[in-house]
Amino acid sequence: MPQFLATLGTLFNNAGVGDAVGRITSWILPSESLFAAVCVYCLGMALFTLIMGNAFAAFPVMTAAVGWPLLIQHFHGNMAAVFAMGMLAGFCGTLCTPMAANFNLVPAALLELDDSYGPIKAQIPTAVPLLVCTILIMYLCCFPGGLL
């Protein structure tokens, strides 16, 4: 399944979604604000995951738009650390979306819960602080001059 979702993300990227998102972010972002770039990348990963249902599909789009050109090439981030933290940010979106049916809706059906969105409602209080912590850890630890 992850291979198919990654392929879906690649198709979105090849269709120009990554370039369009990159143009929008370069127009909005201050050019020398590392923190803003980290926020856009992590929040974008979470948002695209909410829409597409899985971080594997969101990863190629956000990496082509923000991750590679800004965080790696411009700010010289540690590639493995930045992209691992980006996937974690995407997984925060997975916790909050019914599009990730295999994680959120199927268990509710199998457990015969009264509220099919119960797992999502229970996971949001974890997902939001985890996303904030992911942004802070990436900002503080994944770039030259950071804590690591």
Predicted regions and their residues:
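Small-residue-rich segments of transmembrane alpha-helices in multi-pass membrane proteins
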Residues: 1-3, 65-75
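Hydrophobic alpha-helical transmembrane segments of multi-pass integral membrane proteins
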Residues: 28-70
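Hydrophobic alpha-helical transmembrane segments of multipass membrane transporters and ion channels
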Residues: 1-5, 40, 125-133
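Transmembrane alpha-helix interface/packing and boundary motifs in multi-pass membrane proteins
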Residues: 5, 9, 43-58, 88-95
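Core transmembrane alpha-helical segments of multi-pass membrane transporters/permeases
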Residues: 1-17
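Alpha-helical transmembrane segments of multi-pass membrane proteins
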Residues: 36-46, 75-96
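Juxtamembrane and boundary regions of transmembrane helices in multi-pass small-molecule transporters
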Residues: 84, 90-148
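Membrane-interface interhelical connector segments
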Residues: 16-35, 74
